[in-house]
């Protein structure tokens, strides 16, 4: 999740529907995939494989919580790109396959990523649903957030974003030194340590995204 933006999301009085058809620019062409496929492909590309994290002392269940947190963050980032701001305005796609947006590489898909992503796509009340994080400072409004994430903060914590009220500075300790990053939103190495320490996916997300809730949206 690598583009910074000054675009401020609009406040809504109800939960929005989200598109199930995603156009992504990959391998020099625009491809259309369903949302779940897009998310598990991003998840496989943006995090290390399961063996890396079990090697750091996480149990299989803890790795699943980490993966699920990243899946929701990626879904949130995607919805912001579709509904609020994209680096690719005027194109027939809103997200590309590089770190300009979210890394998307179908050759790296793992079963663990598919399984974790399946947890955030489900049927409720006869409708297909998926989870994203939304800024919800009051009981009556919902705002999209830039679902930013990055590799590691090296123990320096995250930073305040000037126009994104959900992206506040929080303290953070990494499980290992990663590739660095912009320090906005979810720290992947910090999230791994929080998972190892027993945090659920939802607790990880709500730690890094301030005054937010995990919202169930209908796929359209």
Protein language model annotation of sequence segments:
Residues 1-220:
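Conserved, single-site charged/polar hotspot
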